[in-house]
């Protein structure tokens, strides 16, 4: 059978989006791996699947597969593309949408200027919720990698993140240290590794090594986690502008227990069909 799909991106973080509300198919990890290959498939960082909700309190269910076939809890840039997609495809007329993910419920607000604001919910710092192995909760933790100790923050934005402060993201060892942090035994479900350079109280540069995808042009939940870690440790004040290789995101967070708001673009690239 042939399935219609849309290729989209949020700041260069690219996605294949499938409507499984009006189409019906059983998508497996092997399909994500096959289609995600940039040489022999469609090529993407993540596969986003739009499904009918399983409870009446939300509008849609949102599933995410990495290009390596692993299913993950959350994707912030993908959430913005999800919102744009369901409106463009007339799956809803609402501009404020409630969506269930493996990481919890998020709210998406499509603004008149085309930007999408995502209410990511409150960040979680309890180690067991991330999950991260630690004796007690702290703002930062020493993490030993190859005999060297790095001071990291650990945050869940519905998916696990580590945040390491660096002097300059351009020279940060993202490709050397990123995969080692991703697979560190203290992160039982692996982790997204962020490298943040604080420019001033409201601006920062960020690169992210994503779990199951490697370094991407942008990571929405990574930007949220980095902003939260920087605000919590007193390095920055909300609102925060995060510059990633693919572009800029605006992050707001009023403090513990409060939701993180992320605003940025969502762009449609092309439409296509793929054989299942």
Curated annotation (Swiss-Prot):
Homodimer. It is an enzyme of class 5 (isomerase). InterPro entries: DAP_epimerase_AS, DAP_epimerase_DapF. The record marks 161, 210 as: Could be important to modulate the pK values of the two catalytic cysteine residues. This is Diaminopimelate epimerase. Pathway: Amino-acid biosynthesis; L-lysine biosynthesis via DAP pathway; DL-2,6-diaminopimelate from LL-2,6-diaminopimelate: step 1/1. Catalyzes the stereoinversion of LL-2,6-diaminopimelate (L,L-DAP) to meso-diaminopimelate (meso-DAP), a precursor of L-lysine and an essential component of the bacterial peptidoglycan. Signal peptide: none annotated. Its main location: cytoplasm. Gene3D superfamilies: Diaminopimelate Epimerase, Chain A, domain 1 (3.10.310.10). The active site is at residues 75, 219. Substrate binds at residues 13, 46, 66, 76-77, 159, 192, 210-211, 220-221. The record marks 270 as: Important for dimerization. HAMAP family: DAP_epimerase (MF_00197). NCBIfam families: DapF. The lineage of its organism: Bacteria, Pseudomonadati, Pseudomonadota, Gammaproteobacteria, Pseudomonadales.
